[in-house]
Structure formats: C-alpha cells, structure tokens
Amino acid sequence: MKALTRHWFPIALIVVVLIVTLLIWKPWGDRFEPLPILWEAAQFELEGTSGETVSLSEHDGKVRLVYFFFSHCPDICIPTTAMLSKVQDELKSRDLFADKTMMYSITFDPERDTRERLLRFSEGYQADASGWKFLRGTEEGVKNLAQQYKVSVIKDQTGNFIHQNLFSLVDQEGNVRKVYSAGDPDVVASGDLIKQMADDMERLAR
C-alpha cells in the first residue's frame, strides 16, 4: 500500500501529460481524417475560352474543384472568383497546380458569357488556363449539370441567376468528396476557406 502511495504522483503526472497531448493534437487528427465519398461526380463536356472542348474525365487522376457562376453576377460571384485566384496561388506555392489539380468555373449564362467575355473575365483574376478553366455550355445543360452538383439555380426576370454559391471537391477517380459553401460574404473574405480547400486538395493529391 505504501509503494502504491509513493508512486501515485508520477503515474498521475504521466496521465495528465498524455491527456494534454491528446487535446493538443486532436485538431491535427481531425484534419487528416479521410474525406468520405459523397456521390459520383456528373460528367461534362463544355467549351473553353479558346474554343476547345474540356471534359471532367480528361483530367481523371487529378483532384478537381468545380464552381458555378456567371460574370454579370451583381454580388457573390465576384469576390468568390477573387478567392479562387488565391486558391490558385496557394496550389502553385505547394507545387500542386495543373500537374495534380484542376479548377473549373462554369457559367450559367452562355448568352452573355461568350468565349471572349470569359477570357477577359479570367484574365482579370490572373487565371492560369493550364489549371483553371472557364467553361460554357447551353443554359439548360449547365442548369441540369449544376443540379447534379447540388447547386440550385433560378433565372430571374432581369436575366440574372439566383444560385447557391457552392464548390464541389472531386477526387482523382471522379467522386465528389466534399462540398464547400461560400454563400456568406464574411466567409469568403476571411481567407479561412482558401486554406481549407487547398489543404483538402493537397490531402487527396499526395
């Protein structure tokens, strides 16, 4: 009994140290938990800014980020595209851009978003076409495609589009692994989502 009493303090100290260590490292453990497969990503073949056909499947083997927008958007699309430009920079700094990852910005509005318009728009955000494609299709086709990525969209009487501001993370095998919401301007402005998306893309790409 005396021996047990004599050793209880160092034993208790070890237990406390272990608990504190687990608490400190838990966020890192959560960070590296596997991302679940949510659903199979919808395939597409759309027109790029040079008139080329771009498909999701041609970039199998790369981690992909899919975003729906339109360049005449009066609010959230503009800061979100600026945010994607920073994601591009982050991926480049990690040697992931183009070789291991791709980003697609797909317009709801092919009537106004011509190839020339999309090219000028993309240049305004220093988009590197080797790893960030601005794409267009038919209005109805893109609407249906967006819905398959769980993005709802409604065309209003002014010709603008009311839509959810979501990103879909697609893995190398064509599975959607995560959906990010950027509907809150504060979230877009904070910079936290930029790092989160880049971190998740790196996790899948490595």
Model segments located where?
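Structural microenvironment flanking redox-active thiols in thiol-disulfide oxidoreductases
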Residues: 81-145
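Structural micro-motif
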Residues: 132, 143, 147-156, 160-168
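Thiol-/selenol-based redox modules, centered on thioredoxin-like
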Residues: 156-206
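Short active-site neighborhood of thiol/selenol oxidoreductases, capturing the structured segment around
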Residues: 57-84
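A short beta-strand-turn-helix
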Residues: 44-64
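Short loop/turn microsegments at loop-to-beta-strand junctions
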Residues: 41-42, 63-64, 164-166
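N-terminal targeting signals for export/organelle localization
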Residues: 1-47, 204-206
